[in-house]
Amino acid sequence: SGSCQLKTCWQVSPDFRSVGDTLREKFQSALFLPLHNGHGGIGGLLVPRDTQLVYFERSPTFCEQEDDIGSPGTRGRLCERTEQGFSGCSSMCCGRGHNVVRETRVERCNCKF
């Protein structure tokens, strides 16, 4: 009949937070697959799923000083007691424990009422 139709399709990226949450879940469940030097193949019986992240070398802990990678470590650094993330004491102190220092100061403030 001589008429034509126009169809437009597009894809929208998912919410940024959901992408981050998915990546974190995949990172936390990533599978370590050591390579066998003699055969050049993957060792063991672990077979990753198609959607699973894998890694072949363990990451440094960054807790101890490692000069070859330029990491000063975390020993002696101040941590944030109330933080839950990387700057928090449980993460930053790497299980070595930490000291809590409480101070009470009495100072003259020269306040006038």
Curated annotation (Swiss-Prot):
GO cellular component: extracellular space
Main location group: secreted
One Pfam match: wnt
Any one biological process term the GO annotation gives: neuron differentiation
Post-translational modification: Palmitoleoylation is required for efficient binding to frizzled receptors. Depalmitoleoylation leads to Wnt signaling pathway inhibition.
InterPro entries reported in the protein's UniProt record: Wnt, Wnt_C
Its job: Ligand for members of the frizzled family of seven transmembrane receptors. Probable developmental protein. May be a signaling molecule which affects the development of discrete regions of tissues. Is likely to signal over only few cell diameters.
GO molecular function: cytokine activity; frizzled binding
Keyword annotations of the record: Developmental protein, Disulfide bond, Extracellular matrix, Lipoprotein, Secreted, Wnt signaling pathway
Disulphide bridges, residue numbers: 79-94
Gene3D superfamilies xrefs: 3.30.2460.20
Native organism: Eptatretus stoutii (Pacific hagfish)
Protein's recorded name: Protein Wnt-10
Transmembrane segments: none
Compartments in which it is found: Secreted, Extracellular space, Extracellular matrix
Family to which the UniProt record says this protein belongs: Belongs to the Wnt family.
Lineage top rank: taxon: Eukaryota
Residues lipid-modified (O-palmitoleoyl serine): 1
SMART domains: WNT1
